[in-house]
Swiss-Prot record:
Pathway: Porphyrin-containing compound metabolism; protoporphyrin-IX biosynthesis; 5-aminolevulinate from L-glutamyl-tRNA(Glu): step 2/2. GO terms for biological process: protoporphyrinogen IX biosynthetic process. This is Glutamate-1-semialdehyde 2,1-aminomutase. It comes from Shigella flexneri. InterPro entries: 4pyrrol_synth_GluAld_NH2Trfase, Aminotrans_3, Aminotrans_3_PPA_site, PyrdxlP-dep_Trfase, PyrdxlP-dep_Trfase_major, PyrdxlP-dep_Trfase_small. GO terms for cellular component: cytoplasm.
Length: 426
C-alpha cells in the first residue's frame, strides 16, 4: 500500500469519511485521495513523493501559487507578535481599507472566518434590513453549508447526490426559493408569486460549484433590475470569483452593482478568512451599530489579516489578471484542440483564472440541467488518467478548476500534452 492509502485507512477510523471536507475524499471520482506533504508554486507533492501540476489551488485561494514568500513572511512576522487577541488591531483597519479600495461597491466590510459565515451573515443582514424572510438562490449554486442554502445546492452536495441535505428542517427550506441560473423568467416568476416577501437574491456571478458556468450577458444586469423593481437586495457571492476574475471581482468584470458582496478564499491568502460588505446604510444595521447580530471569536485575527493583506497587495500588482487570463485561455484552447483531434466532444468554459471541463455533445453549458447532462463517468476516467500523468484536477465533475500566476506556459503546454495522450486512450 502507498503511504496515502495507509493514511486514508487510518483517517477513516477517526474522521467521518476520512476527510474534513467531503470533496477531498474522491467520492466524485473514486479511488484513494492524495495526502499532501508540501506545495510550492504551481506544484503539489504528495506523501509518496510524486509531484503534480495543481489546478485545484486549495479550491481557489492560491491565485499567486503555493507558499508565496510575501504571504509566508507576513504570517511568520505576525505570529511572532501573538496569535489572537480577541481585541481590535491596526491590521484589521488596514485590511478593511484595502478591501473597500479594491471593491468600490463595498462601503464597509465585516471580517469573518469562512465563505459560509460570510453568506450566512449577509443573508441574515438582508432579512433584517428588509424585514422579509424569503431568499432566492439558483439551482446548482453553492454558498456554503448554512441550513437555508443547502437547497438544490452545488459543489459536494451534487457530488454526493444530495443537493437537499438531510438535517435541514422543511420550515427553514420553505423560505428558500430556487430559480434556474441564467433564466431571468424563473426569477421574475418567483418575485411575482411573492412580491413583498423576498429579502434578497444571492448569486454566484460565475457559477463555480456546478463546475464553471459563466452568466449570459443579460443575466446579472437583469437580476439587478428585478431587485430594484421588487425592493430586494442583490447579494453577489464572490467567494470564488473575488480578486480572481478581475481585481474588483466578477461584479466589475460583468458591470453589475450589488448591495452586498461576500468574499473568501483569496482574501485570506490561504488562511481561513471570509468577509461581507456593501452599502453603508445596509451595513449600519449590523451589530453593534444596528440590531442584526453577528459575531466571531477569531474574526479578524491578526495572522489571517496579515496573510490576506499581503496576498491582496500582490494580487493588485499590474499584469496579474492579464497573466491569469492568458494562461487559462491557452489551457482551454489547448484542451479543446486535443479533444477534437481525438474525436472527443468537449466544452471548456473559462473566465479569468477559472475554468471548467465538460464531456458533452452540447455546444454550450449554461445551467444546471446542462451540467447534469454531461458524461460524469468519462470525467472520472479522465481525472485518474491525468493524475497518473502528474496533473491534479478537481476530483469532481462539479467543481471548477483554478489557475495561478505561478503556472508557467511550460506547465500549461505539458498539461495539454498530457491531455492529448489521455484523450487518445479515453
Amino acid at each position: 500500500m502507498s503511504k496515502s492509502e495507509n493514511l486514508y485507512s487510518a483517517a477513516r477510523e477517526l474522521i467521518p469519511g476520512g476527510v474534513n471536507s467531503p470533496v477531498r475524499a474522491f467520492t466524485g471520482v473514486g479511488g484513494t485521495p492524495l495526502f499532501i506533504e508540501k506545495a510550492d508554486g504551481a506544484y503539489l507533492y504528495d506523501v509518496d513523493g510524486k509531484a503534480y501540476i495543481d489546478y485545484v489551488g486549495s479550491w481557489g485561494p492560491m491565485v499567486l501559487g503555493h507558499n508565496h514568500p510575501a504571504i509566508r513572511n507576513a504570517v511568520i512576522e505576525a505570529a511572532e507578535r501573538g496569535l489572537s487577541f480577541g481585541a481590535p488591531t491596526e491590521m484589521e483597519v488596514k485590511m478593511a481599507q484595502l478591501v473597500t479600495e479594491l471593491v468600490p461597491t463595498m462601503d464597509m466590510v465585516r471580517m469573518v472566518n469562512s465563505g459560509t459565515e460570510a453568506t450566512m451573515s449577509a443573508i441574515r443582514l438582508a432579512r433584517g434590513f428588509t424585514g422579509r424572510d424569503k431568499i432566492i438562490k439558483f439551482e446548482g449554486c453553492y454558498h456554503g453549508h448554512a441550513d437555508c442554502l443547502l437547497v438544490k445546492a452545488g459543489s459536494g452536495a451534487l457530488t454526493l447526490g444530495q443537493p437537499n441535505s438531510p438535517g435541514v428542517p422543511a420550515d427553514f427550506a420553505k423560505h428558500t426559493l430556487t430559480c434556474t441560473y441564467n433564466d431571468l423568467a424563473s426569477v421574475r416568476a418567483a418575485f411575482e408569486q411573492y412580491p413583498q416577501e423576498i429579502a434578497c437574491i444571492i448569486v454566484e456571478p460565475v457559477a463555480g460549484n456546478m463546475n464553471c458556468v459563466p452568466p449570459l450577458p443579460e443575466f446579472l444586469p437583469g437580476l439587478r433590475a428585478l431587485c430594484d423593481e421588487f425592493g430586494a437586495l442583490l447579494i453577489i457571492d464572490e467567494v470564488m470569483t473575488g480578486f480572481r476574475v478581475a481585481l474588483a471581482g466578477a461584479q466589475d468584470y460583468f458591470a453589475v452593482v450589488p448591495d452586498l458582496t461576500c468574499l473568501g478564499k483569496i482574501i485570506g491568502g490561504g488562511m481561513p478568512v471570509g468577509a461581507f460588505g456593501g452599502r453603508r446604510d445596509v451595513m449600519d444595521a449590523l451589530a453593534p451599530t444596528g440590531p442584526v447580530y453577528q459575531a466571531g471569536t477569531l474574526s479578524g485575527n491578526p495572522i489571517a489579516m496579515a496573510a490576506g493583506f499581503a496576498c491582496l497587495n500582490e494580487v493588485a500588482q499590474p499584469g496579474i489578471h492579464e497573466t491569469l487570463d492568458e494562461l487559462t485561455t491557452r489551457l482551454a484552447e489547448g484542451l479543446l484542440e486535443a479533444a477534437e483531434e481525438a474525436g472527443i466532444p468537449l466544452v471548456v468554459n473559462h473566465v479569468g483564472g477559472m475554468f471548467g471541463i465538460f464531456f458533452t455533445d452540447a455546444e454550450s453549458v449554461t445551467c444546471y440541467q446542462d451540467v447534469m447532462a454531461c458524461d460524469v463517468e468519462r470525467f472520472k476516467r479522465f481525472f485518474h488518467m491525468m493524475l497518473d500523468e502528474g496533473v491534479y484536477l478537481a476530483p469532481s465533475a462539479f467543481e471548477a478548476g483554478f489557475m495561478s500566476v505561478a503556472h508557467s506556459m511550460e506547465d500549461i503546454n505539458n498539461t495539454i500534452d498530457a491531455a492529448r495522450r489521455v484523450f487518445a486512450k479515453l
